[in-house]
Amino acid sequence: MKLRAENLSRRYRGKYALNNVNFELSGGNVCLLLGPNGSGKTTLMKLIAGLVSPSGGSIELDGDPIGTATKRRVAYMPTENYFYNYMTVRDAGKYYADFFPDFDRAAYENRAQRAELPLDGRIRTLSSGMGAKLRLSLALSRDAAVMMFDEPINGVDMITRDWVIDEIAARKDSGRILLISTHLVEQVEGLANRALFLSHGELVRAGSLDEVRSGRALEDVYREIYGGEAGC
């Protein structure tokens, strides 16, 4: 399995959110997508998920351009809840089951209960930590080749953070491509074997963790790259 981007770009209102990005990931890769807010991480994930289209270049999964056919092979945990106000945690599972044939509703409800999510509770009443558990439970209940997690531990408490990391870690050896977007490097470094560093929409460093660290902590590499940028 290969996920390949070539000269990938995306513009919004004439400004590049992502510019001339090139990379290749293979099955079994657990890749950290690193950078401060506004670096292009979410835009890249939305391109991979087929939620937005490239302004230039290409992105392919096993040689197929990202689009309707590949959407069924990509699971995406976004940063926000996007459900209707009236929907319950149980309703979210029904919603996913209607859209994704690979969604295991029974596994989702089991995972949600283990996460102490109220199946009949309205999503709009969930705390930020519970919202993160909901989005992760939905994504992990799909049998997708590519699984993406956008800022999965941002703004959550320590207990929720540990639960999220454990749930993602359980997929490490599944042969899938896992892509984890974050700026909280230290907490997720142990999950990954590769890293992509984005800055102002451009890929500034990429490779295996051993290559990019060169014997240092990944957090030190992050500071070296982004130390002069606001918001780091």
Question: Predicted regions span which residues?
Answer:
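ABC-family P-loop ATPase nucleotide-binding domains
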Residues: 80-134
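The feature captures the beta-strand-to-loop junction immediately N-terminal to the Walker
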Residues: 34-36
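Catalytic Walker B motif of ABC-type/P-loop ATPase nucleotide-binding domains
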Residues: 147-151, 156
